Every structure is written in structure tokens, then in C-alpha cells.
């Protein structure tokens, strides 16, 4: 993964953190060790959130598998994705 892709992904994760705060009043943070240790991009108990920010929406089933694999016991996976110049989908 190139630097531009990592930057775009991190920006998407920050957008979702901000949207969660604006809509739910809950402060959440990115999982900065996700690349090294695996796991979800964002944890919001009982949810494990995988964020995808891409030029176009890809294989959502693969993303859901990734989100499921990043869950701790008792958590529910959520995939949040956005294609360029489109709205977020969950």
C-alpha cells in the first residue's frame, strides 16, 4: 500500500470518528496499531468498525470478512465505506 492510500484511509477513519462524535456525542479514536496488530479501524462497543475509503466501492463481502475477523468476542462487525465524491455507506 502506498503512502497516498494510507493517507486517504487515515483521513476516512478521522471522518468517521468525527461523524460519530457529531451524531452520537461519543468520542472515538482510530486504532493506530491496526496495521501491525490487526483488528478494527475503530472500536465502538459493541461494534467493530472497518472503514474503507476508495475511488470506487469494491468487494464488500471481502471487507465484511475483514471486519468480522477483526472483532473481539461479543462484538458486531460494521463496514463503513465511501467512494470518491459520494456519501458514506454503512
Whereabouts are the PLM-identified features?
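Catalytic phosphate/metal-binding cores of nucleic-acid and nucleotide-processing enzymes, i.e., regions
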Residues: 1-90
Amino acid at each position: 500500500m502506498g503512502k497516498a492510500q494510507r493517507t486517504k484511509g487515515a483521513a476516512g477513519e478521522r471522518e468517521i470518528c468525527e461523524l460519530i462524535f457529531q451524531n452520537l456525542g461519543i468520542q472515538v479514536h482510530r486504532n493506530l496499531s491496526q496495521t501491525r496488530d490487526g483488528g478494527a479501524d475503530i472500536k465502538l462497543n459493541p461494534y467493530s468498525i472497518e472503514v474503507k475509503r476508495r475511488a470506487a466501492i469494491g468487494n464488500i463481502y471481502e471487507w465484511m470478512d475483514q471486519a468480522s475477523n477483526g472483532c473481539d468476542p461479543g462484538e458486531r462487525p460494521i463496514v463503513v465505506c465511501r467512494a470518491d465524491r459520494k456519501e458514506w455507506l454503512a
